[in-house]
Amino acid sequence: GILKTYYIDTYSANKMGMEQTIGSPSILTMRNGDKDLDGLIASIDKGILVTGFNGGNCNSTTGDFSYGVEGFLIERGKLSQPISEMNATGNMLSLWSNLAEVGNDPRLSSSWRIPSLLFNGVDFSGL
């Protein structure tokens, strides 16, 4: 994909000296990809399926983040063992630059209509 614009609300625009692009998003959506979650998992040789977050933080100025995560280890396209008490760390700009694939399974029970996402190069610790 190509980033065409940023979501910048009034507060952030004033703080950064930029022009406001939105008021506040009420429903965030993303164009669906071709694979469901099982298809995304099958395409991964070694990785981690994050199913939940256990606290953490993100610096809104730098984009640096650290979140506790839980989920499953993926090996050779299959879920292997459950994981917990791990951390995912990085930078939001780098994370979104490394978005590799988008699923076709958005959750409809949330104001964020975002499908499963596959990222490359995420740093995890604690396994």
Can you name each region flagged by the protein language model?
Residues I2-L127:
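Dual-mode signal for accessory low-complexity, basic/Gly-rich regions
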